[in-house]
Regions:
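Pre-active-site segment of Zn-dependent metallo-hydrolases
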Residues: 27-32, 39-82, 94-103, 107-111, ...
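Histidine-centered divalent metal-coordination motifs
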Residues: 79, 83-90, 151
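Metallo-beta-lactamase
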Residues: 1-22, 38-49, 110-156
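Conserved phosphate-coordination/catalytic loops
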Residues: 61-64, 87, 150-153
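Catalytic core of the metallo-beta-lactamase
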Residues: 17-25, 30-39, 135-158
Length: 158
């Protein structure tokens, strides 16, 4: 699992018109995929997945990304872009939406169908926007263009 460097307390100030990319999980491990992109005081989240525990984690069902960096900034989040429907990319969405339920979820038809089913179990009704290959969307300060990618699950986008 990834752990923060003990000497780092907070990131340096972001330059004017700068972009900061903050991985909150998924580095050095297979799972907990979650990346935050910061620009102009706004945040875009890409994926929000779980990590399945190994044998040396008895009694633990799921391991979530570390939400601490964004917990106090949930009002700055423009959207959560979901690249595909694997649990290591969507499994933590219900836990993040407990902090702020009205964050838009952006993804392909299959990906959103999978997360909507998961959110029904948690009694969360999401706001969603279905996107397709080649589509461009303005998500607050972020201009996004979606591209189809090959993966072991259909309807994956980058």
């Amino acid at each position: 699992m990834s752990h923060p460097h003990p000497e780092l307390t907070s990131p340096p100030p972001l330059a004017t018109n700068g972009v900061r990319v903050i991985p909150l999980g998924g580095l050095g491990e297979v799972g907990r995929n979650m990346t935050v992109i910061e620009h102009a005081g706004r945040l875009l989240i890409v994926d929000c997945g779980v990590l399945f525990p190994e044998d040396h984690h008895p009694g633990i069902d799921l391991i979530l990304p570390d939400f601490e960096y964004i917990e106090d900034r949930m009002d700055d989040v423009e959207a959560i872009v979901l690249t595909h429907g694997h649990e290591d990319h969507i499994g933590a969405v219900p836990f993040l939406l407990r902090l702020k339920a009205d964050i838009p979820l952006i993804g392909s038809t299959l990906t959103l169908a999978m997360i909507e089913a998961k959110l029904r179990e948690h009694k969360i009704k999401p706001y969603t926007l279905t996107v397709t290959e080649g589509q461009r969307e303005k998500l607050g300060v972020f201009d996004c263009e979606f591209a189809a990618v090959n993966h072991s699950i259909p309807d994956a986008l980058a």
